[in-house]
Curated annotation (Swiss-Prot):
Transmembrane region(s): 146-166, 256-274
Gene: NUR1
Protein name listed in UniProt: Nuclear rim protein 1
Principal location: nucleus
Disulfide bridge map: none
Protein's cellular compartments: Nucleus membrane
Native source organism of the sequence: Vanderwaltozyma polyspora (strain ATCC 22028 / DSM 70294 / BCRC 21397 / CBS 2163 / NBRC 10782 / NRRL Y-8283 / UCD 57-17)
Record carries keyword ATP-binding: no
One GO BP: maintenance of rDNA
Function: Member of a perinuclear network that controls recombination at multiple loci to maintain genome stability. Required for rDNA repeat stability.
Family under the similarity heading: Belongs to the NUR1 family.
Length: 401
């Protein structure tokens, strides 16, 4: 005993100083800190590596190999769960329901009459059988809870996918050089100077809830609201003088998410929840899956691809007919000696630096005066341009009726 006490005293001396203060092992603390930092760095590096790997995958190319099979499997699993709930578990609940509320053996009124004793005996036998079935219902009870848990999990997954597909996939484009407002409800008017400024024009194109919330927030600013309404009606003819621009919020879900949403549609799940599922219900589910796939991918997605092909063909036609002929003109600068000395006129050609040439030509007469001429394509001759130094005036003549 004395030896053990001495060892404990030695251990206590190792942790306490001569002044009675507790001594901390610095090496062990540094080891734990380094281990903690290494673990945190490992998890952060692992998260970064997984994020980069997922971002590098082209998910649109995997819509048929991953998204569509996963969505169909989840829909089929939900159908099987609802089928088991409406066929197997519904009969189980009806047969093995507790009958203690209808226990006639506990009635004192029936026991007073001899001719009613047989009903009491029948009730006792049923209660005994029910008690035996309660012991055997453990597996079916937990199986019911498991199906309910899977059903809630699938519904939560579908709600998250639907929310992401409908409200989380938007791209914003700033239309800086558009003068008139485009005819779209996704276009909003934004200020170039004040980011918090809102326009009445955006509210008029919004929903009723947007209008109501705007009027509630600006209830005390009626004067500013009226001034804003008057400024909205005025259109600025010059684009550079505008203090606002239009912003387009385009809904653009990815092809992978669209395929997952169509194969795992919330309408199919709601239909299975609200209806009595049987084996014939599978026909409606299969038709729903095929119709959604045909309408969205075979119809609408193909239409978008065909429109992009038509637009690219139109752009190619414009480039070949108008843009390339103007940009690929082979032109040269020419200098002609038009002096009357001698009968031989000298002409020099120089490489052109630009493809854009002016129709005005400057020459000098015999007295050294500068003359400006323009080539008239109609008569195929040069004409002298007069009054070239005068300022131009934009005059609009209105004929009175």
């Amino acid at each position: 005993m004395n030896g053990l006490d001495d060892e404990n005293q030695i251990d206590e001396r190792d942790h306490y100083t001569d002044d009675g203060d507790y001594e901390i092992d610095i090496d062990s603390m540094n080891m734990f800190k380094s281990l903690y930092y290494e673990m945190m760095a490992y998890f952060s590096d692992l998260q970064m590596h997984l994020g980069e790997h997922l971002m590098a995958i082209d998910w649109d190319m995997k819509c048929k190999s991953i998204a569509e099979p996963v969505g169909n499997c989840l829909t089929a699993l939900f159908y099987i769960i609802r089928l088991l709930q409406d066929t197997l578990l519904s009969n189980y609940k009806d047969v093995y329901v507790s009958t203690e509320a209808f226990d006639l053996s506990k009635s004192t009124t029936l026991q007073e009459f001899p001719f009613l004793i047989r009903f009491v005996e029948v009730s006792k036998t049923k209660n005994l059988q029910n008690a035996k079935y309660i012991k055997k219902k453990t597996f079916m009870f937990y199986f019911d809870k498991l199906l309910l848990f899977l059903m809630i999990l699938i519904l939560s997954t579908n709600a998250y996918i639907s929310w992401t597909f409908i409200w989380r996939n938007f791209k914003t484009y700033s239309l800086l050089y558009v003068v008139d407002r485009p005819n779209s409800k996704n276009v909003t008017k934004c200020s170039r100077t004040d980011l918090d400024q809102s326009y009445m024009e955006n509210v008029s194109y919004g929903s009723y809830w947007t209008m109501l919330s705007y009027y509630i927030r600006n209830f005390r600013k009626k004067d500013d609201l009226e001034d804003e309404i008057t400024t909205v009606k005025q259109k600025t003819p010059n684009v550079n003088e505008k203090d606002y621009y239009y912003q387009l919020k385009k809904w653009s879900p990815s092809k992978f998410l669209t395929s997952l949403f169509c194969s795992f549609s919330p309408t199919c799940l709601v239909f299975l929840i609200l209806s009595d599922v049987s084996f014939t219900t599978s026909i409606a589910v299969i038709l729903h899956q095929f119709i959604f796939k045909y309408v969205v991918f075979e119809g609408y997605e193909s239409r978008i691809n065909d429109e992009s092909i038509i637009h690219s063909a139109m752009i190619s036609e414009i480039n070949q007919k108008f843009v390339e002929p103007r940009l690929s003109k082979k032109v040269q600068d020419a200098k002609i000696d038009a002096t009357p000395e001698g009968k031989v006129y000298r002409t020099e050609f120089f490489p052109s630096l630009t493809n854009c040439k002016s129709n005005l030509f400057n020459r000098h007469d015999l007295k050294g005066r500068s003359i400006t001429e323009s080539y008239n394509d109609r008569i195929k001759e040069f004409e002298i341009v007069t009054n070239t130094n005068n300022e131009t005036h934009n005059v609009i003549k209105v004929v009175k009726k």
